[in-house]
């Protein structure tokens, strides 16, 4: 089984995250990147 992705790490979809939530957030460059909540 794969380990879950932690908060603020890039994620492909909600199910990948330990929190079960992956949303778009702005990075330092102002780009929208999906990261775990």
Curated annotation (Swiss-Prot):
Gene Ontology terms, MF aspect: calcium channel inhibitor activity; toxin activity
Disulfide bridge map: 4-18, 11-22, 17-36
GO biological process, alphabetically ordered: defense response
Top-level taxon in the UniProt lineage: Eukaryota
Pfam short name (any one): Omega-toxin
Record site feature (Critical for insecticidal activity), residues: 10, 27, 35
Localization: Secreted
Keywords: Calcium channel impairing toxin, Disulfide bond, Ion channel impairing toxin, Knottin, Neurotoxin, Secreted, Toxin, Voltage-gated calcium channel impairing toxin
Database matches in InterPro entries: Omega-atracotox
Expression across tissues: Expressed by the venom gland.
Recorded GO CC terms: extracellular region
Principal location listed in the UniProt entry: secreted
Notes concerning its domains: The presence of a 'disulfide through disulfide knot' structurally defines this protein as a knottin.
Function: Inhibits insect, but not mammalian, voltage-gated calcium channels (Cav).
Family that this chain belongs to: Belongs to the neurotoxin 08 (Shiva) family. 01 (omega toxin) subfamily.
Name of the featured protein: Omega-hexatoxin-Hi1c
């Amino acid at each position: 089984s794969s380990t879950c992705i932690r908060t603020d790490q890039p994620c492909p979809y909600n199910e990948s995250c330990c929190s079960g939530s992956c949303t778009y957030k702005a990075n330092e460059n102002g780009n929208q990147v999906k990261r775990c909540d």
